[in-house]
Amino acid sequence: MAENKQNLQDAFLNHVRKTKVPVTIFLINGVKLQGVITWFDNFCVLLRRDGQSQLVYKHAISTVMPAQPISLYDGEE
């Protein structure tokens, strides 16, 4: 049986990217970044705000908080 499930981190980041939900990213050093996630991969996230992009390395991220509630549950298990 082939499992084709996406991990939670990728599902979350992809959802906020596709829906363009503004997020607040807290870094492990306490810095707060805000913007819209436009791209991500295994190692980093591209955050856009006011026409500027910031490349943020995932190892520096503590928390990603969307500006509004999101639902990742699609009713299937």
Curated annotation (Swiss-Prot):
It comes from Jannaschia sp. (strain CCS1). One of its GO terms (cellular component) is cytosol. Residues 10-70 form the Sm domain. It comes from the Bacteria. This is RNA-binding protein Hfq. RNA chaperone that binds small regulatory RNA (sRNAs) and mRNAs to facilitate mRNA translational regulation in response to envelope stress, environmental stress and changes in metabolite concentrations. Also binds with high specificity to tRNAs. One of its GO terms (molecular function) is RNA binding. The gene is hfq. InterPro entries: Hfq (IPR005001), LSM_dom_sf (IPR010920), Sm (IPR047575). Homohexamer. Belongs to the Hfq family. Transmembrane segments: none annotated.
